[in-house]
Curated annotation (Swiss-Prot):
Organism: Staphylococcus epidermidis (strain ATCC 35984 / DSM 28319 / BCRC 17069 / CCUG 31568 / BM 3577 / RP62A)
Recorded metabolic or biological pathway in which this protein acts: Protein modification; lipoprotein biosynthesis (diacylglyceryl transfer)
GO terms (BP aspect): lipoprotein biosynthetic process
General function of this protein: Catalyzes the transfer of the diacylglyceryl group from phosphatidylglycerol to the sulfhydryl group of the N-terminal cysteine of a prolipoprotein, the first step in the formation of mature lipoproteins.
Listed InterPro entries: Lgt
Keyword Iron-sulfur included in the entry's annotation: no
One Pfam family this sequence matches: LGT
Entry protein name: Phosphatidylglycerol--prolipoprotein diacylglyceryl transferase
Gene Ontology MF terms: phosphatidylglycerol-prolipoprotein diacylglyceryl transferase activity
Length: 279
């Protein structure tokens, strides 16, 4: 690993011609940690310990593919002239919202096939997802991407950041806002809140709470970033999607409480699709 002033090599190590990047290692660690945390939640509601294996496997694969497609779509003017770069996901360039869409769709399909209740599974994995996202942002840090606008070294020192973060925010002769860190901290706080409140919330509300919490933080952090995917010259895609997710989640939670009076998560027990108790 090559570490010099202001630079941490994105490549952790090489195996012959194969470069193993910190980006992939960190994302894999986030997924694994999230899986083990979700395993404990499975036991609490009486579901089998292997329930999430297929869901996480397919959601991770489809999520990564859709996340890349999402990113490439909004950067098509570049990729249309660099087609060989499209599959090089290890260089970075995936969009969390794309991954969320792909993971959500595949997760619902697997729940249907496995006869699982999607809201219950969503509540189980929501804290793990936001924690994995918070950890994954450190992959952006290692790749020297997803940072904010220029700042001074004095500004970063005023934040009392560790020296290795300050050094690695020195990119091509300029210090930048560590927006990866802002979002990572926000996500970890969200993880603690969701884990703490999950038992008190109605079925499905932990997942929608995740969407709301993540989207609020992403909206404000995105305004600081210099590499946003743009819908128009003034509209950032991530901010627009965040607003839509907040609105949908709030409306859905209110509607379900008024219309259906859903049961509490802690009282749900093992549920099947759509809401029948498993025998």
């Amino acid at each position: 690993m090559n570490i010099t002033l202001g630079y941490i090599d994105p490549v952790a190590f090489s195996l012959g011609p194969i470069q193993v990047r910190w980006y992939g290692i960190i994302i894999a660690c986030g997924i694994l940690l999230g899986y083990f945390i979700a395993q404990a939640a499975l036991k609490q509601v009486g579901l089998h310990k292997d329930t999430l294996i297929d869901i996480i496997f397919y959601s991770a694969i489809v999520g990564f593919i859709v996340a890349r497609i999402y990113f490439v779509t909004f950067q098509w003017p570049y990729y249309m002239n660099h087609l060989s770069e499209i599959p090089k996901i290890w260089h970075g360039g995936i969009a969390i919202h794309g991954g969320l869409i792909g993971g959500l769709i595949s997760g619902i399909i697997v729940c249907k096939i496995k006869n699982l209740h999607p809201f219950q599974i969503g509540d189980i994995v929501a804290p793990s997802i936001i924690l994995a996202q918070g950890i994954g942002r450190w992959g952006n840090f290692m790749n020297h991407e997803a940072h904010g606008g220029p700042v001074s070294r004095a500004f970063l020192e005023h934040l009392h950041l560790p020296d290795f973060i300050i050094r690695n925010m020195y990119i091509e002769g300029q210090y930048y806002h560590p927006t990866f860190l802002y979002e990572s901290i926000w996500d970890v706080i969200g993880f603690v809140i969701l884990i703490t409140l999950r038992k008190r919330l109605k079925l499905g509300e932990t997942f929608f709470g995740y969407l709301i919490w993540y989207s609020v933080g992403r909206f404000f952090v995105e305004a600081m970033r210099t590499d946003s995917l743009m819908l128009t010259s003034h509209i950032r895609v991530a901010q627009l999607v965040s607003v839509v997710l907040i609105m949908i989640s709030v409306i859905f939670v209110i509607y379900r409480r008024v219309k259906y009076q859903p049961i509490k998560y802690e009282n749900s027990g093992p549920l099947t699709w759509p809401i029948k108790k498993a025998k």
